[in-house]
């Protein structure tokens, strides 16, 4: 005996991308004391474009997303009651965010004008980058570089020995 049904098979739900369009597999997610102000700083210093701001009921930023170059950066306000403390509350950060740019000197000048603290001014480095180090007003450490010279692995290893051990 055969049975027939008039029910249509369930429509397949379109597949979602595990890594959404515009995201990379690693995205920094910063805790800031003053995340809205941090977004404004990153716009001035690094040319960030604001993508999203979600405010918590108490007015703090619970999620912000900006784009710098081809990469996303997520951030939110410090929420110590949830264990989310900023570098300012922790008295520092062991993490450095690296930004690769077309013109390190221009970005360095913009960041300093926007309020970044100079940790190391731009200089040509043995690995082939013109490179600088900054601290933003929210306690996050940044390295910024422009690649200026290709260096072979052998040259790089020799230069690293000389740089670290005095030759």
Describe each model-derived feature in a short phrase.
Residues 2-29, 39-40, 46-135, 145-167:
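Vicinal oxygen chelate
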Residues 32-36:
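Short acidic-aromatic low-complexity motifs
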Residues 138:
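C-terminal catalytic core of tyrosine-transesterase DNA break-rejoin enzymes
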């Amino acid at each position: 005996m055969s049975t027939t049904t008039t029910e249509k098979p369930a429509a397949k739900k379109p597949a979602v991308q595990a890594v959404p369009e515009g995201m990379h597999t690693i995205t920094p997610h910063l805790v800031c004391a003053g995340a809205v102000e941090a977004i404004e700083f990153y716009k001035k210093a690094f040319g960030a474009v604001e993508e999203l701001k979600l405010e918590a009921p108490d007015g703090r930023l619970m999620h912000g997303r900006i784009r710098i170059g081809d990469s996303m950066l997520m951030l939110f306000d410090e929420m110590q009651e949830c264990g989310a403390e900023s570098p300012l509350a922790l008295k520092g950060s062991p993490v450095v965010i690296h930004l690769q740019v077309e013109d390190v000197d221009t970005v360095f000048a913009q960041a300093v004008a926007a309020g970044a603290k100079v940790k190391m001014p731009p200089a040509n480095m043995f690995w082939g980058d013109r490179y600088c180090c900054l601290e933003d007003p929210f306690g996050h450490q940044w390295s910024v570089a422009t690649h200026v010279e290709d260096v072979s692995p052998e040259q790089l290893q020799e230069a690293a020995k000389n740089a670290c051990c005095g030759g």
